[in-house]
């Protein structure tokens, strides 16, 4: 038997040894997947995941490069860092309390409460309609990121980095999250029949007013 044949045989043996382990791991995952499979719509889930990526690309790098091209050369890096920092800070804020305030199961018509803070009560089987709730939360997070980033154009070249972070954090916490609940989270505006398919109210009106006030 040649050396190559021995090597091939040893490789096959090692693969067969790993097969039972892989089967056990797959068996552990099957029950949880089966529980979520009944209500899961694969096409809708795939589309929301695609949309999540597209909205994220609107901010990073889309919006950051757009604003970077409108300023003087010495301020390009500052604008890019502002957009990237907003994405990081708002992502953390969304995980901590943002999703809960915007989409928590509260009886209040003005905010969602804190029952979903740190994604409490959300697991692999949690559903939002016919898609996983984690996918829905990720999709909505991209809107929470791009909204304060839109305001950057109002103060570009005229604000400290630390002041920008503080304003965006407080503005998102006290303006964006509640308004998202009012419209998309079953709040009082939604109950009155307001329909916002693409963020015209939640994103653009709030960001526009915020930019006008801070300009």
Identify the meaning behind each predicted range:
Residues 3-215:
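Hydrophobic alpha-helical transmembrane bundles of multi-pass membrane proteins
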